[in-house]
Amino acid sequence: MAEKKFTVLDLLDLDLPGHDALELKCIAGRRGLPRTITVPDINRPGLAISGFFDAFAFQRVQLFGRGETAYLKKLHDENKTDTLQQLFNYKIPCCIFSSSREPTEDFSRLAEEACCPILSTPLDTTD
């Protein structure tokens, strides 16, 4: 019997009423919800969004906290989306924004184009 793959949609389905520990919601990239999560770890992509991809753990769920979100805003304000385009050239399972933070318009647009799900949670990165 084939082993069932765990997808981003499965991650969202874990948040059923009464089991809503992560309080996740999909805010962009819905077409990518069938993407498989093959590595059960997270990655903080600070180095990647600054342009360093040599050791980028793209197979992991990418977790964006306060620092990463502030840097995304700086990239947006300076109209620099090259590194974001590079980020989405990798087949990332999904990105999660903590503390109800939201990605920039550029980030959301590129995620949509790459079919990369963007999830949001009100929880802090340390929760």
Regions picked out by a protein language model, each given a short descriptive name:
Residues A2-F88:
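Gly/Thr-rich phosphate-binding loop signature of adenosyl cofactor/nucleotide-binding cores
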